[in-house]
Amino acid sequence: MLTHLIEFVYRLLWGDLFTLPVGGGIGISLMVVLLFTAGIWFTLRTRLLPVRLFRDMIAAVCEKNQNKEGLSSFQTLVVSTATRVGMGNLVGVVAAVSAGGAGAVFWMWVTALLGASTSFIESTLAQKYRQPDPLYGGWRGGPAYYLHALAERRRGKKLRHSVTAALFAVSGLICWCGISQVISNSVSSAFQNAFHIPPLTTTLVLTALAALIVLRKNATVKSLDVMVPIMAVCYFVLTVGILVVNFRQLPAVLGRIFAEAFGLRQIAAGGFGTVLMNGVKRGLFSNEAGSGSAPCAAAAAACDDPVKMGFVQALGVLIDTVVICSCTAFLMLLVPQDLTAGLSGMDLLQTAMQYHLGGFGTVFIAATLALFSFSTFLGVLYYARGNVAYLCGDNWWSQTVYKLIALVMLLIGGLQAYTVVWDLGDVGIGLMTIFNMIALYPLSGEAMDALNDYEKRKKLQ
C-alpha cells in the first residue's frame, strides 16, 4: 500500500504534466516547470546575480565568524556541501547518466546555473526568519519557519503551527529518510564490487558506526570542517588528473553531451523528456537549489548580513554541479560505451574508475563513498533538527526518535533494489520544492530589498 502511494505521488511530481507535440512527443513534468520557472524568474530579478556578484560570493565564504554561538559562513557551506558531495555528486550524477544518458549532464548544468539565484533567495530568507535554538544552541530555521511567518502575516495573528510549514517539515523528513536509504544502498553496492563483501555485512557495519556518531545527545557537525574539504579536494585532484591525461577526448565528450541534450534522435524517439527530467531531477538532488534543504543550514550561520549567507549558498550550488558533478560525469563518459552498456549505479562508476586507474579506482571509489556517506548522513540529520523541533517542540525525545527512524532507513536501504531506494527521496524533495515555492514568490521581495540595500552600502564603502 505504502509503495503504491509513493509511486502515485512520484508520478504526479516527476511524470509528464503535459507533452509537447514535437517528434515522438516531449514530456514535461511538474517539477521541471516549477524549477525552470523559478530559476529564470529569480535569475532575471537578481539581475544575473551569479555572474555580477561572483567575487562577493567568494568573499562571503572567506569571512571570519566573530560570533561563537553559530556556524561560520565556511562551516555552513561545509554542512550543505556535505550532503551534496558524495550522494549528489557521485550517486546523483551516476543516476542521471544511467537513466538519461550524456545529455542529462547538460540539464544538470542548466538547473544549477538557474538554481544559484533561487538558492540565494531562499537562504537569505532563512537568515531573516531564523530563531534561537534552545536545544543545540545557536540558531535554527529554514522554509518551515518563513512559511510560518508568511501564514501569520496573512492571518494577521500568531499561530502555533502553519499547515504549509508543517507539510514542508514532514516532506523534508521523508526526503532525508530517502537519502539515508540511498547512502547505504550505494555504499553496500560499492563494497560488494570492490571487496566482495555481502551488502548485509556492509549495511550492518555502516548503520552501527552511524549510530555511534548520531545518537549522542548533542552531536555536532564540527568533524565535517576537516572531513569534507579533504575528501572533496582528494576526489577533485584525482578526477582532474584523469581529465588532464585524457584531454584530447574531452571535445568529443562535450560534443556528446550537447548532442544528446538537444539531439534529434532523442526528440524523434520521444526520449528528450527522459533526458531533461533526469538532468533536472538529479540536478535538484545534487545541488538542492529550490528544495529548501540548504536554508536549514544557512539559518544556523552567525552572519551579520542575510545577503552574505545567500551568496555562500549560491556559490555552493555552482561548486557542486558545475565543477564537481562535471568531473564525475566526464570520468564516466570518457569510457568506451561498449564497456558500460547495461550498467547503472555504482557498477557504472566503479567500472569507469577501473578503466582509468585499474583495481585502485574501484577501491578508491568505495572508500571515498564510505567517507562521504558519513558526511551526508550527518548533514541531513543537521537539516532535520529544526524541522523536528517545528513539528514536535523543543524536546530531546523527538530528536532521538527521528535519528532512530533515519538509522532504520539506513539499514533497509542497503538491502533494497537500486531503483526503489531513489523513489522515497525523489517524492520528498519534490514535495519540499512545491511547499518552498509557496513562500519564495511572495517573500522574494524582502530578499531583493536586502540585496539592493547591500549593493547601496557597498557603493558607499
Regions found by a protein language model. Give the residues of each.
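Extracellular/periplasmic helix-exit of transmembrane alpha-helices
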Residues: 122-134, 240-256, 270, 300-303, ...
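Alpha-helical membrane segments and immediately flanking helix-loop junctions
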Residues: 67-99, 125-128, 135-150, 163, ...
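Flexible loop linkers connecting adjacent transmembrane helices
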Residues: 48-73, 95, 101-102, 117-159, ...
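Membrane-interface loop-to-helix entry segments
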Residues: 34-35, 42-58, 164, 185-191, ...
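Helix-loop-helix module between adjacent transmembrane segments
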Residues: 38-43, 81, 114-139, 148-185, ...
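Transmembrane helix-loop junctions in multi-pass membrane proteins
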Residues: 45-50, 89-93, 175-188, 211-223, ...
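N-terminal alpha-helical transmembrane segments of multi-pass membrane transport
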Residues: 1-87, 97-104, 115, 439-461
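Selective recognition of specific alpha-helical transmembrane segments in multi-pass small-molecule
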Residues: 114-122, 202-217, 228-248, 281-284, ...
